[in-house]
Design a protein with these regions (language model features):
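Catalytic-core regions of core metabolic enzymes
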Residues: 1-325
Length: 325
């Protein structure tokens, strides 16, 4: 028989007391029959590898939905289409996409947990309007961390207006955003501020355990730059996020000096315009990435890179295969 049903219709808890009653009836049906429910307010599921497109989202009428290793779970049905178009533009493919809706039965955590042992999935992207079924989400996130599969989330509700919209959309309980932020951080879930960042942060997250996922997680960051002003902006933003820039150790400074690279004992390695030469930036990156006191390196390039990207961007790209990000 049928084991799972998807409910596209809205008009449940988000619509008031009568809708909440209808939602409770759905829960009772699920409990008494063993039927699992995806939704309400779900636009369905997509499995690119198998060619399954079970969704009312018109974005999937587009041919060649990219297949890959990222699994998406979203409270918003329209956002799975938006994420596919953005991922496609960045060369990101998907192992599956699920529009979860109001989570009357099946939740984000339970759905994602069911895929944890799929070798074709390397990480997760979540679009969250609220935090429901916290125990299931917590259990999933911890198991994902143990398997080295990063979880990246974009969660609405930072402002009171956005929280109100989320509540009227899927009946979500808004709650205090700082509590949600602490909850996600404690699970090692990386919360991003911009939608595009969901995919941009993914390669970094795969290389470095996220905070909260492991007690051995390293956050010692070195900054190398061709522009002092740009580096100061980066250091400022890192500081706002509780990340301290690591000064380069004396032994590493000595190695840089031997390689003919100027350096000082400050928190930023400023190569000045000399860093626009490939061999200077590449050698500096090699030495910093090998330094035991550093877990990751942020390279900051100036405006010269816009017109001659090979000067400063190419050595960064050529360092991407290093074990450290």
């Amino acid at each position: 028989g049928v084991g799972v049903v998807t409910i596209l219709a809205s008009g449940f808890s988000e619509s008031g007391p009568q809708g909440a009653q209808r939602e409770q009836q759905l829960r009772q049906i699920a409990r008494s029959t063993g039927l699992r429910i995806l939704g309400p307010s779900s636009l369905g599921v997509v499995h690119p590898r198998n060619g399954l497109v079970l969704t009312a989202n018109a974005a999937f009428a587009e041919p060649d939905v990219p297949s890959g290793k990222v699994f998406v779970a979203s409270h918003s049905g329209s956002m799975i289409g938006a994420l596919v178009s953005r991922g496609k533009a960045r060369g990101v493919g998907f192992a599956g996409l699920v529009s979860v809706g109001s989570e009357v039965d099946l939740s984000v955590g339970e759905i994602c947990a069911a895929t944890l042992d799929d070798p074709g999935i390397e990480g997760y992207v979540l679009f969250l309007e609220s935090l429901r079924h916290g125990d299931a989400l917590q259990a999933f996130a911890r198991e994902a961390a143990l398997r080295g599969k990063p979880v990246i989330a974009y969660k609405l509700g930072r402002s009171s207006a956005a929280a109100e919209m989320a509540a009227t959309h899927t009946g979500a309980l808004a709650g205090e955003d700082d509590i949600a932020d602490a909850f996600l951080k404690g699970l090692g879930v990386a919360r991003v501020d911009m939608l595009e960042t969901l995919f941009e942060v993914f390669p970094l997250a795969r290389k470095l355990p996220l905070a909260g996922a492991s007690p051995a997680c390293g956050q010692r960051v070195a900054v190398v730059t061709t522009t002092g002003g740009g580096a100061a902006m980066v250091v400022d933003q890192l500081g706002l996020r509780g990340i301290t820039v690591q000064p380069v150790a004396g032994e590493t400074l000595a190695r840089l000096k031997e390689a003919g690279i100027p350096g000082s004992a400050g928190r930023v390695l400023d190569l000045t315009l000399a860093g626009t030469r490939y061999e200077v930036m590449k050698k500096a990156l090699d030495i910093l990435l090998q330094a035991p006191e550093i877990d990751m390196v942020v390279a900051v390039v100036g405006s010269s890179a816009r017109y001659q990207p090979d000067l400063a961007v190419r050595p960064i790209m050529d360092s991407a295969d290093h074990a450290k990000p």
